[in-house]
Amino acid sequence: MKMLILAVSCLLAITGSLAADTCYNDVALDCGITSNSLALPRCNAVYGEYGSHGNVATELQAYAKLHLERSYDYLLSAAYFNNYQTNRAGFSKLFKKLSDEAWSKTIDIIKHVTKRGDKMNFDQHSTMKTERKNYTAENHELEALAKALDTQKELAERAFYIHREATRNSQHLHDPEIAQYLEEEFIEDHAEKIRTLAGHTSDLKKFITANNGHDLSLALYVFDEYLQKTV
């Protein structure tokens, strides 16, 4: 009975094919061999040389890992500003939001990796050279905003790097689907976040330097109240 079902499946697969390709060849090969199972190793979601040439596939996995790491970094800052000593609820809210967004992007990238027929590997590293130092959560308010701004620029520049790798327009490296995904889900979003954080950094600097810095505590308190209402 199993052999009959297998034979019918093979017949349907072969007669339903429009052209001979890798998946079709796997089906035809397995149907020509006496077996109780169909392996079909190339009947998957991989196409366009994704994962076979260049480093777009590995870079995308490394990008998911980077978002995960930055999500935890932001979460550490959120916890630091939420303790009883610092007591900056607005800053904590801002960093918690950044952490949640980075976490959400991590999940989204992993889903897209599997959508393209690949598996997520958290051991992948980017080939892009960076000079980033270890993240420190216990920064004062202006330093924390500056660090967040640098982090968002890091994520944006990594997206540019992957986009450039995906759009080389060569026989094996061109992947417009990945390029479109980055443009729609990351690049515009990064521009908005960078502009917002740059604005926060500039505004806080003006608060701090007003009146020659004599009202520092009041300036930080007022700005934290502002973040609580706007984030």
Swiss-Prot record:
GO terms for biological process: intracellular iron ion homeostasis; iron ion transport. Oligomer of 12 light (L) chains and 12 heavy (H) chains; L and H chains are disulfide-linked. The functional molecule forms a roughly spherical shell with a diameter of 12 nm and contains a central cavity into which the insoluble ferric iron core is deposited. Glycans are attached at N134. It comes from Trichoplusia ni (Cabbage looper). One of its GO terms (cellular component) is extracellular region. Pfam families: Ferritin (PF00210). It comes from the Eukaryota. Keywords: Disulfide bond, Glycoprotein, Golgi apparatus, Iron, Iron storage, Metal-binding, Secreted, Signal. One of its GO terms (molecular function) is ferroxidase activity. Residues 1-19 form the signal peptide. SUPFAM superfamilies: Ferritin-like. Belongs to the ferritin family. The keyword Secreted applies. Residues 50-208 form the Ferritin-like diiron domain. The keyword Magnesium does not apply. The gene is Fer2LCH. This is Ferritin light chain. Disulfide bonds join C23-C43. It is found in: Golgi apparatus; Secreted. Its main location: Golgi. InterPro entries: Ferritin, Ferritin-like, Ferritin-like_diiron, Ferritin-like_SF, Ferritin_DPS_dom. Stores iron in a soluble, non-toxic, readily available form. Important for iron homeostasis. Iron is taken up in the ferrous form and deposited as ferric hydroxides after oxidation. Ferritin is composed of a heavy (H) chain which is responsible for the oxidation and uptake of ferrous iron, and a light (L) chain which facilitates the nucleation of the ferrihydrite iron core.
